[in-house]
């Protein structure tokens, strides 16, 4: 209804009523009623979303939920503050989502949504939930960003040769997979080198199997392993395999990357086969950079199996 019709908007008794609480990751109760907050929400599914970040500034009052993976809160009295980083997928695709990520009421702040339902939790199994990081910062606009960056640097060693890149992707010419082949890639590599590109990533179309986005044949993201040759170079496009393209890239000082889509059916039950496909490409061609696409994580089991896929690939490669 119309919010103007709300009753007891300033009733002290109404403000003290206890609200039903969902499972939460973290909560803080701090002094002061003049907190200035900013919630930052991110969006994936970039086929549909072109605006990938949304910020909302607010001063907490009545108990209200906000969406996002980041919450910055600054005390209006002295300028110091803290942040919550909810380590989880974007709000729109989280599992067991309670409708918001942060619940704020005056100086009370809670991170909600653990990434699982009651049915997902079993005494016999370890179930990984979403996590939360709390950090503090001082005055100034740069201070919270430096605090957040300090945490990120601590959890992952920065290696320029691995983490810094200028990538060129073959999908950008709007031809889908119709032009991708050995001759095309060799020519594109020459252009990429002139542009200073460090990584050349061949998107959908390099492989023998066909995806539903193929312009040359009707394919699917499901039941990929019905075709055991799905993740091998397409013979009609790459008659010599990927070796000539890999060698050309090395000559030009460019690293070659590939598109890869894990088999999604039955909660990624074929994750071990997907691991072997990626590891084989790494060992045969030295491919280290993969664009992972087409993910659909709708259950906790799917999330668990996908995590096994990523972790096992890391274990089997150096």
Locate the predicted segments by residue.
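Short, flexible, glycine/charge-rich loop motifs used to bind or transfer phosphoryl groups or to couple energy/partner
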Residues: 156-157, 190, 280, 313
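A generic structural signal for well-ordered alpha-helical segments enriched in polar/charged residues
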Residues: 70, 80, 251, 312-315
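Catalytic-core region of carbohydrate-active enzymes that cleave or remodel glycosidic bonds
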Residues: 303-318
């Amino acid at each position: 209804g119309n919010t103007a019709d709300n009753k007891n908007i300033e009733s002290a008794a109404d403000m003290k009523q206890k609200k039903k609480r969902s499972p939460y990751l973290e909560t803080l109760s701090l002094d002061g009623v003049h907190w200035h907050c900013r919630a930052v929400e991110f969006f994936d599914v970039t086929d549909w979303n072109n605006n990938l970040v949304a910020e909302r500034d607010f001063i907490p009052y009545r108990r209200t939920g906000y969406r996002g993976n980041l919450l910055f809160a600054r005390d209006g009295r002295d300028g110091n503050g803290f942040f919550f980083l909810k380590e989880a997928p974007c709000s729109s695709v989280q599992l067991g989502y309670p409708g918001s990520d942060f619940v704020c009421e005056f100086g009370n702040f809670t991170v909600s949504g653990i990434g699982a339902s009651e049915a997902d939790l079993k005494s016999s199994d370890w179930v990984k939930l979403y996590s939360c990081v709390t950090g503090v910062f001082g005055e100034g606009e740069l201070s919270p960003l430096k605090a957040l960056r300090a945490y990120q640097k601590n959890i992952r060693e920065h290696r320029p040769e691995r983490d810094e890149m200028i990538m060129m992707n073959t999908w950008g010419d709007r031809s889908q997979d119709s032009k991708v082949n050995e001759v095309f890639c060799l020519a594109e590599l020459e252009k990429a080198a002139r542009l200073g590109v460090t990584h050349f990533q061949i998107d959908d179309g390099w492989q023998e199997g066909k995806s539903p986005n193929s312009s040359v044949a009707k394919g699917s993201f499901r039941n990929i392993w019905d075709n055991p040759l799905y993740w091998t170079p397409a013979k009609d496009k790459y008659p010599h395999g990927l070796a000539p393209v890999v060698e050309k890239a090395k000559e030009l000082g460019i690293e070659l990357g590939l598109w890869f889509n894990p088999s999604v059916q039955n909660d990624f039950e074929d994750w071990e086969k997907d691991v072997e496909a990626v590891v084989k490409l790494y060992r045969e061609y030295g491919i280290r950079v993969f664009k992972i696409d087409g993910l659909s994580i709708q259950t906790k089991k799917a999330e668990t199996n996908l995590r096994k896929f990523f972790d096992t690939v890391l274990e089997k490669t150096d």
